[in-house]
A protein has these predicted regions:
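N-terminal signal peptide c-region/cleavage motif recognized by signal peptidases
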Residues: 14-16
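Thiol-/selenol-based redox modules, centered on thioredoxin-like
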Residues: 132-162
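Structural microenvironment flanking redox-active thiols in thiol-disulfide oxidoreductases
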Residues: 62-103, 115-120
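Short, internal strand/loop/helix patches
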Residues: 99-133
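Aromatic-flanked redox-active Cys/Sec active sites in thiol-based oxidoreductases
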Residues: 51-57
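Boundary of Sec targeting at the N-terminus
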Residues: 19-21, 34
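A short beta-strand-turn-helix
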Residues: 27-47
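Positively charged n-region of N-terminal signal peptides that target proteins for export
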Residues: 1-4
Length: 162
């Protein structure tokens, strides 16, 4: 029993450390096709919210829409960046920019993770997944899935890292 418990702890300890790490050194692209190193979102020293989503994910679209509706109010109360990372692959990534523009989501930074490198590095298994990084780049909050009202929980977490 003791040996089994020690084995489980030994397996989980490295994952605990990984959960607290910041952003990996990975290149994604912006909607214009320009290379973008994800670590550069931390350059201003403000908290960053990263939302992983894709175009055919209904909860993802609901979440982004709900956040878009309150984003300007949030910006009045807190200093942070919001980055939406599309995990659409090469077959569907061409739909991202028209969707973003059509929905009027102009206040966020939208990035494309076509090869899934960032998604894998951040251990994102399903979408939507929201990750909040504090000013130092430490992951302080993660939420998987979306139901109406989750955006308020996210904002409470954003306020904690101001």
């Amino acid at each position: 029993m003791k040996r089994s418990l020690l084995f489980v702890i030994a397996l989980l300890l490295p994952m605990l450390g990984m959960a607290q790490k910041g952003l990996p050194n990975i290149e994604v692209t912006d909607l214009d096709g320009n290379a973008f190193n994800i670590q550069s979102v931390m350059e201003d020293g403000v908290p960053v919210v990263i939302s992983f989503w894709y175009t055919t994910c209904k909860p993802c679209l609901q979440e982004l829409g709900a956040i878009n509706d309150v984003y300007s109010d949030w910006q009045d109360e807190a200093e942070f960046k919001f980055v939406a990372v599309s995990t659409d692959d090469s077959r569907s990534s061409s739909k991202v920019a028209p969707m973003v523009n059509g929905r009027g989501w102009n206040d966020f930074l939208f990035l494309l993770d076509v090869n899934g490198d960032l998604k894998r590095a951040m251990n994102v298994q399903t979408q939507p997944t929201v990750i909040l990084l504090d000013r130092k780049g430490n992951i302080v909050y993660t939420h998987i899935g979306y139901t109406p009202g989750n955006e308020e929980e996210l904002f409470e977490e954003i306020l904690k890292v101001q």
